[in-house]
Amino acid sequence: MSSKSELESLLNKIVKSNDETEVSKALKEIEDNNEYIEKKQLRSLLTMHDKKFKDQCLIPMNNLYVKYNDIVGKDRNLQNETAFVDRDIRVLESTLQYIIENKNSHNTNHGGCNKTKNSSKDKLLDK
């Protein structure tokens, strides 16, 4: 039993010891370095990066925005205009398809009897 109590007392002495060991010195140095890195170096690195980012990216982009903003402002309704053009194209395609189908059904119903030679309408519809 004395060996168990002796081990516990040695363990308590080691755990509660105020004496610095090589390991505790290394740990303290690591913690101090970490604090220095986070408080000093990281902040200066972020500041430097922010300045570089602003100089290389943000300021040129802002200059382009200022330069071309008036041109873009005139084209704000471009999407609406393209929607109207797209709609008109679809209407024309549907109309042309309807005419072609109507012509084909007319020719099959009448056997092509009413067809005139080289009619300009037929040439247009054949295209």
Swiss-Prot record:
Polar residues compositional bias, start-end: 105-117
Superkingdom of the organism of origin: Eukaryota
The segment annotated Disordered runs over: 103-127
Where found in the cell? Endosome
Keyword list (alphabetical) reads: Endosome, Transport
What GO biological process terms are annotated to this protein in UniProt? endosome organization; regulation of protein localization
What protein family does this chain belong to? Belongs to the BLOC1S1 family.
Subunit structure, briefly?
Component of the biogenesis of lysosome-related organelles complex-1 (BLOC-1).
Q: What is this protein called?
A: Biogenesis of lysosome-related organelles complex 1 subunit BLS1
* Known role: Component of the biogenesis of lysosome-related organelles complex-1 (BLOC-1), a complex involved in endosomal cargo sorting.
A single cellular component GO annotation: BLOC-1 complex
